[in-house]
Amino acid sequence: MVDSIHRIASALDTAKVITREAAAVATSKLGESSYTYYSQNINPQQLVTLLNSRNSREVRDAMKRIISIMASDDDSIDVQLYFADVVKNITTNDTKVKRLIHLYLLRFAENDPNLTLLSINSLQKSLSDSNSELRCFALSALSDMKMSSLAPIILHTVKKLVTDPSAMVRGEVALAIIKLYRAGKNDYHEELLDILKELMADTDPKVISCAVLAYKECYADHLELLHGHFRRYCRIIKQLDSWSQSYLIELLIKYCKQYLPKPTVVDKSSEGSPRSCPLPDKYNEIEYPSYEVVNDPDLDLFLQSLNCLIYSSNPTVILSCCNALYQLASPLQMKNTKFIEALVRTVTMTENQGNKEMLLQAIHFLSILDQTLFLPYTKKFYVFPKDPIVASIWKIQILSTLINESNVKEIFKELKYYVASAHFPENVVIMAVKSLSRCGQLSTSWESHVMKWLIDHMESHNLSASVLDAYVNVIRMLVQKNPTKHLRIIFKLADLLTVQTSLADNARAGIVWLFGEIASIEFKICPDVLRRLIQNFSNEGPETRCQILVLSAKLLSYDIDNFKQAQVTGSEENNQNPPYYDFSGSRISQMYNAVLYLAKYDDEFDIRDRARMISSLFDSGKYEIVSLLLQAPKPTARSDDFIVSARLETHTPEIKEFFRMLPWNTEITEVGETGNDIREGAELKDYNKYKKSFSSQSFITNNSARSFTSSSNAKLTGINDGDSNSISGKGNVNTFTSQNGKKYRLQSLDEFFSDIPERKSKPRKIIKVVEESSDEDEDESEESSDDDEYSDSSLGTSSSGTSSSHLEL
């Protein structure tokens, strides 16, 4: 009775499992939305039931629901309450469930260390599993637990798995070094360094990729570790992971600066014995018009190894290669490579806006140092209306650095389109206006052309205050360079002060300041400008009011100097003492007093303090000091500082640090302590020889010539004659040698079945059954049938005899 009940219960459980599996399959066929709806309807009580289920699919559904709650920061269910139910499933054979439990432990392992220790035993057992993926998962799970008590266990595990036959596991060992170093670098510094040295001597490029990450993160200052691996890393850099390539290039740049001699620049233009000098510390400072660079062979090896990375899809790799050429090569060498083209191509092809802005900043940085690098790609930096604002601003700044006599017409036309078009944001228009000043600085003719276009466009269009401010600032800067040749422009600026009432405070203050600067050249128009400004003094902005005060003081100072000069000349002719300046009778002095009176009661404390300072100077009669302060010539604003916006006037700190020029080491030793070359190849460690089996992937990798293509097509695909012979059957392509030296041969089906021994057939015994009948009629009918049977039996007997004779033979 008990057995029957047990059989019925097991049958019901089996039916339940089959039903749930069928439901899960049906749900998966309905699509992701159906599964999401099912997952969201799992309540807390069902989570406990699913986690305690013996069905791995139900446990997986529960873990997926828990991870989704953790990712969405859903506060409706406290997933930490299921810690014990989750941890006990660590012994499952389902790899996906183990990965989900690993993610759960990352979040909550520190909150309950006692329960976390329950999973340690299972993870340690997985470290000895035959599946390399499970070993890798176990090591990753152990090293990710942020518990100080586990550090010795992890260190012991890392030391054990550093010689694992699987490259994936050894790569995970390198990542575990990073986690241990962050947890307690002072406690395990030497042990981790020894393990890293073993990983750096590995023969597998995948392990080297992970080891480079650990080296860059933990021991980047120990450049001496690269001595025995420098040349090998240069040769295998194309086989590494893209991010590891970037880190390795940065490390090798520092190594070259520290342990390789500085390149020598040889002058080819001089006659007789050629002159030479070390490569300058700053970029593009070589004085020779024609030169060649002599590099150390190891430096040439590193620079040539970068050529295989030109077509890398990772923008960071391209930037790192450009930085290597910027740090270690001459401008001519950098120009002759294809990395400038690759950098421009990466900018145009990438869709990630963060990467594009970073690349544009790098191009702008390099174009400031040497504009000839990017002159062939000027049109690649034209702005499109759909470009983001920051990327558009960087493109315009790059265009401004590329302006010269040969392309100024095209760039000026393009900048005018950005300014006049309504498709571009205001920030882009302002930057385009500021970049026009670079066109005006090429020559006097372009200076007049730019200012004329700006004034005409300003008078014919209704511009916003910020754009109008940019117009005025550009015109003011260009006029200040040569005011005598632009008097007509100056008169128009004077009219703008009264006509354009919407001018921003900064723009109006700039125009007023400009009249104070040209007072020594064209003094006659300045008093009339001051007279107009006094009438609306109280309605002006604080910057404009301050500049009106300074303008009135400057005009009074110039008027006093002109009066003294005229009186000194007249008194010398008449031999009389020069009279004093009449402040009460001078119209300029009266305007100065009016402005001074208004400024003393201004709301801005800066204007009040400045008014008291200026009045004290004039009241003391120290006019020479006043002239020295107010009439001193001001330096012309530099365009490099002017065209950049307030937000992007400098590059980001990351770009500055990335392109920071490293100094060369002058004390270099090429010989080690034993007298050998310090870069002599170190002893490598090949752990693949410990493998006890081989896979189809390894066979195909070692027999790459095996193909279904004909020998006539082999040459078209780059296969040599020997490979084509092996394809056609002449070569020994069916042989394979394992890591431990044992040879195998791939057999065909006929060869495989030919090894099966032939089985001999046994003789069969034939039994004849004869039925008798009492009916005479039936006897007659059966006689004929008996005859037939007799003939058949005789044939069967003869055949059996034949077979028996065959067996006897």
From Swiss-Prot:
The modification Phosphoserine is found at residues 693, 698, 724, 726. It is found in: Golgi apparatus; Cytoplasmic vesicle, Clathrin-coated vesicle membrane. Residues 772-791 have a biased composition (Acidic residues). One of its GO terms (biological process) is Golgi to vacuole transport. Transmembrane segments: none annotated. The keyword Protein transport applies. Residues 722-739 have a biased composition (Polar residues). HEAT repeats lie at residues 37-76, 112-151, 153-186, 187-224, 524-561. Residues 792-809 have a biased composition (Low complexity). Signal peptide: none annotated. It is a peripheral membrane protein. Residues 708-739, 763-809 are annotated as: Disordered. It comes from the Eukaryota. Keywords: Cytoplasmic vesicle, Golgi apparatus, Membrane, Phosphoprotein, Protein transport, Repeat, Transport. InterPro entries: AP_beta, ARM-like, ARM-type_fold, Clathrin/coatomer_adapt-like_N. Pyrophosphorylated by 5-diphosphoinositol pentakisphosphate (5-IP7). Serine pyrophosphorylation is achieved by Mg(2+)-dependent, but enzyme independent transfer of a beta-phosphate from a inositol pyrophosphate to a pre-phosphorylated serine residue. GO terms for cellular component: AP-3 adaptor complex; clathrin-coated vesicle membrane; cytosol; Golgi apparatus. Coiled coil: none annotated. Part of the AP-3 complex, an adaptor-related complex which is not clathrin-associated. The complex is associated with the Golgi region as well as more peripheral structures. It facilitates the budding of vesicles from the Golgi membrane and may be directly involved in trafficking to the vacuole. Required for the transport via the ALP pathway, which directs the transport of the cargo proteins PHO8 and VAM3 to the vacuole. Adaptor protein complex 3 (AP-3) is a heterotetramer composed of 2 large adaptins (APL5 and APL6), a medium adaptin (APM3) and a small adaptin (APS3). Belongs to the adaptor complexes large subunit family. Present with 3570 molecules/cell in log phase SD medium. This is AP-3 complex subunit beta. It comes from Saccharomyces cerevisiae (strain ATCC 204508 / S288c) (Baker's yeast). The gene is APL6.
